[in-house]
Amino acid sequence: MANRRQSRRRGNKNRNSATVRRAPPNRATQSSSGKVKFVKWIAASPTKLIPHIGENETSYGVLFDITGTTFPELSSLMSRHSRYRVLSLGARIVPYDPNCLGAHSVKVFAESVYDSSATPTVPSVHYLQSNGCRVVPANKQLSSPPSSDVNKYYEICSDDAVIGRIMYAWNGPGLSTARVGFCSFEVYADLEFDGIRE
């Protein structure tokens, strides 16, 4: 009996130790390897409806313009380092937001960030300078983007942690800004810092 009780206790202990604790949102975490993972939750209302000129003529895009959103946590990190290598940067719509009707069928894409010295043909060399940045949009005519390059519709820029972006969410016919409503987004950034300031 005593052995059975001890093994039961051990089993409970192991189960409890396997509990995963999630970090709260809106936090920048820094590892010892010189990489930063940043996540922030924001919300936005759609500003206008744009026809999608492409394979499906009845498809429409909803424009979410949240340019000028500030990230104080990222700003403090950038003030301590001269540059970052951008591993990934973009936004995901939060699924099943009760305020965002049809969120489960909305797709979100994001454009990359480039340093002024980099070229669009070298996507592996992305640098955010702490004193400014430059956006290299894949398509200047955002109102009618080609269907063959759907993952390059947005502009994202960072200048002292002010990151603005233009987000398109594609959906089927009958879509309207009123139907979509107020949507939540998860903005994410995986950065590798370099050039620590003295």
Curated annotation (Swiss-Prot):
Stretch forming the signal peptide: none
Main location (coarse class): virion
Keywords: Capsid protein, T=1 icosahedral capsid protein, Virion
GO cellular component, one term: T=1 icosahedral viral capsid
Segments of this protein annotated with the region Disordered: 1-32
Cystines in this chain: none
Basic residues bias locations: 1-13
Cellular location(s): Virion
Function of the molecule: Capsid protein self-assembles to form a bacilliform icosahedral capsid with a T=1 symmetry, about 50 nm length and 20 nm large.
Name of the molecule in the record: Capsid protein
Source organism of the structure: Mushroom bacilliform virus (isolate Australia/AUS LF-1)
Lineage of the organism: Viruses, Riboviria, Orthornavirae, Pisuviricota, Pisoniviricetes
